[in-house]
Amino acid sequence: SGRVHALDDVPQAIAAAQYLQLIRDGRDPAGRSVAVLRQQAEQLAQQQNWPSAIERYETALATGQAPALLWLDLSQAWQRRLQSTTDSTLQQQARQRAQQAAWNGLEAARAPFERARALFRLGELYDQAKNSRQALAAFREGLDLEDEPRIAKRYQELAAALAFQIKGVEVDSDSATPKICLNFSDDLS
């Protein structure tokens, strides 16, 4: 099938799994509970101390007891970190980590509303990265699970922008058998 599905992003899945392993290997909860670590992360986020908030979210996730939506909080913290720096290397890392955390949130989600939120988050990140087809697929899958007017509106905008279109026309009228060639936005199959 020529349709792109949000879950077909193998490079993202691999990078997200590597990020999860990095968290497990590099963060030690030292007996602290998810609730305590999450509360600390939220306080640090309110203070816009993104590096420390990220560290606390990651440490909470390292407990193995964290809810799936905590991954989305981490993704949001990485996005705020991205917006708060002008360092291009850090921006690239933050952009990647935000997507990887959202992907891990999708992988960890069990309840339909958790899957929907993770798909919406992933769709927004794909959209910001100008990966419209992946964004469309993630939004579509999320909207199948939960109605969200803002996402539905963006989905319609992307769907219209990506609609099957004629992108170019070439005409060869100088030969004995004139020819026309149409270039489409997608494969015909």
Indicate residue ranges for each PLM-predicted region:
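N-terminal non-catalytic regions of secreted/periplasmic and cell-surface proteins
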Residues: 10-22, 28, 44, 65-66, ...
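Structural motif corresponding to the intra-repeat A-B loop/turn of tetratricopeptide repeats
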Residues: 47, 81, 85-88, 92, ...
